[in-house]
Amino acid sequence: MKVITCEIAWHNKEPVYSLDFQHGTDGKINRLASAGVDTAVRVWKVEKGPDGKAIVEFLSNLARHTKAVNVVRFSPSGEVLASGGDDAVILLWKLNDSKELEPLAFQDEDEAQLNKENWTVVKTLRGHLEDVYDICWTSDGNYMASASVDNTAIMWDVVKGQKVSILNEHKSYVQGITWDPLGQYIATLSCDRVLRVYNTQTKRVAFNVTKMPSESGAEGEARSYRMFHDDSMKSFFRRLSFTPDGSLLLTPAGCVESGENVTNTTYVFSRNNLKRPMGHLPCPGKATLAVRCCPVYFELRQALNKGEVSQKSSPALLNLPYRLVFAVASEDSVLFYDTEQSFPFGYVSNIHYHTLSDISWSSDGAFLAISSTDGYCSFVTFEKDELGIPLKEKPQIHVRTSVVTEKKVKKSQPNKVISPGSRLTEGTSLSTPTLQPKTPVAAAKDLPSTPVGIKNVPVSSSEERKISQPASQSTKVNQPRRITLNTLQAWSKTPRRVNLIPLKPDTPASVYTDTVPVPPSSEQEHERPLPSGDSLQNPPASKRPRTEEMPLSVSAEDQIGCKPNK
């Protein structure tokens, strides 16, 4: 494992908020999309050189947003790139094989000449009232969901370019969203400190997760504490994720209270029980803000010596016939985990001066890209089979049928957020992907809800959301209906007392007994100058639109090699 920071002004030295590798291209080319404060989306080509270092080549500058761009996500097939920003719109881009360039009204002529690829906007999705913070796709690429500062999440029919449903239960910014690979759930995470899991068929909340019992209260007194950080967390994003097989839901921005001690953590939920976490992954440093899973399935580890198993093995997160790898990014570090153990096997820190913002895996698992608000991006590179031996064939998973769209003619709904209707723009329509559902090897119900060796972390049942039943209508003629309004108190249950096993004070420190140290090259100083002030102690600079046109920092003729940290 090598850590290198590229000496590239990715977005004119402005903060970089998001990046994403393109998948589904059969390894022909590793395209990486990046976005940030300069309002542009840029596409790069990433290759591994003979010395193991990343070689980055500029491909295209996508200029259409009018304010900062907060998120970029390729569709599973890699054909479509979605971008969302502070201008409250989501743009869908496709690679145009023709030589016709994007209209110069949206792009500087000099910058357009540097483009080696031509990406054009095929649809514009309008529905949010404020900044778009996160985007996720369905497995077939026909639908997507977005999260926004307007306290809502929206489900979209990408083919039609229309809203399917508006999810408006959150009370504050929705900073992260993920769509279950099996198509059954959408999970959102907000700075209102609530994780909400929606059923994609009913468009209603299936689970609310917000508190868990605490043992710090006096005897006979039931107390609980919040599981997630509030809006004082120094990040704009809380990017949660399902594992590729849908067996686990991984949520950042967690916190665990044990007496007066508060530990930053990432919660792990089993698909069979999304009401409460099956465990958590402590982070001794800053709060965690993003989780991304490697798309490669690996074979299980083979024990070299039977005597080593009892001494060094740690409890597995889930008993699976394969091994999954994922990365957890905090404000200043990245930890690497797999599903065969609850301790991290790798740890990278002190690679950027400012807060990290996003991470992304390449399709072959050879790269993990890391973006930061200091304006730079880093790459963690892995040698062949360093993460494990890939499976020859990916396991087949059963994907549920597509979500049902809302009826066109519908009575007014006072609970819905009134927002501008979505409309289509320029031209080319998206083709419908032809991904067929696959037959599962093992049904999801066969997966254990609580693996051996992992302690359950109970959550108060008072936080389980109930959906109120509609009041019965009167059968009398010419008389108004009687409607019963249920208050929040009427929805709640009397909390039950559950004993929570307290964390030991040395829990965070003990996590790193098996971690892999950072390469010596990453411990040296960076060649670029250190910004004024300790930025890790301050939140990122406020977002702002570009006030003037800035020249592109890289030449189209150059292939820029990434130098290791010094």
UniProtKB/Swiss-Prot annotation:
Pfam families: Beta-prop_CAF1B_HIR1, CAF-1_p60_C. Residues 411-481, 501-566 are annotated as: Disordered. WD repeats lie at residues 11-54, 64-103, 127-166, 169-208, 228-279, 351-392. Signal peptide: none annotated. Coiled coil: none annotated. PANTHER family: CHROMATIN ASSEMBLY FACTOR 1 SUBUNIT B (PTHR15271:SF4). Belongs to the WD repeat HIR1 family. Acts as a component of the histone chaperone complex chromatin assembly factor 1 (CAF-1), which assembles histone octamers onto DNA during replication and repair. CAF-1 performs the first step of the nucleosome assembly process, bringing newly synthesized histones H3 and H4 to replicating DNA; histones H2A/H2B can bind to this chromatin precursor subsequent to DNA replication to complete the histone octamer. This is Chromatin assembly factor 1 subunit B. It comes from Gallus gallus. The lineage of its organism: Eukaryota, Metazoa, Chordata, Craniata, Vertebrata. The gene is CHAF1B.
